């Protein structure tokens, strides 16, 4: 947790004006919230792994679940954010999520610089002929302008 957490917090300090300080009031509170969440996860990890609640996996490889196993799948702060992974990676990862989920939600739809993801239009165009695709506004906004999510779901 040490150095990566310090690096992230330093980047946050340098970009404080890019954030909405409503739900979380300041950097100290943000750091406390994040570290508390990390400690909670780590305290549960070994038992959760033994109980198969945590399963190691790398998208876009095939998930170890049957088609349509889940009602909703969520990609949080990963897909569409890391455009360096490339268009094909994102299409394959989303396709695999849609194989096991009736609906997926991707949040946020901005890149690491809080700009609209370069590939959002291409991803929407790719999936919209086979799935219901929409961008929904959310009440949650931490990065300024970052209050939208992409929803892709199977037609019923």
Label the model's feature ranges:
Residues 82-96:
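A short, conserved alpha-helix within the catalytic core of class I
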Residues 1-53:
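Class I S-adenosyl-L-methionine-dependent methyltransferase module
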Residues 55-57, 105, 134:
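Hydrophobic/aromatic beta-strand patches that form the interior of the parallel beta-sheet core
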């Amino acid at each position: 947790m040490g150095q990566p957490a310090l690096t992230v917090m330093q980047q946050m300090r340098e970009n404080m004006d890019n954030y909405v300080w409503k739900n979380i009031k300041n950097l100290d509170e943000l750091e406390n919230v994040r570290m508390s969440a990390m400690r909670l996860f780590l305290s549960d990890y070994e038992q959760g792994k033994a109980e198969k609640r945590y399963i190691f996996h790398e998208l876009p490889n095939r998930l170890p679940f049957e088609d349509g196993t889940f009602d909703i799948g969520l990609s949080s702060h990963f897909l569409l954010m890391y455009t360096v992974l490339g268009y094909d990676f994102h299409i394959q990862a989303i396709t695999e999520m849609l194989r096991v989920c009736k609906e997926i939600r991707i949040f946020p739809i901005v890149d690491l610089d809080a700009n609209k993801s370069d590939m959002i239009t291409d991803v929407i165009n790719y999936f919209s002929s086979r799935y219901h695709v929409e961008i929904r506004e959310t009440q949650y906004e931490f990065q300024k302008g970052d209050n939208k999510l992409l929803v892709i779901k199977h037609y019923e």
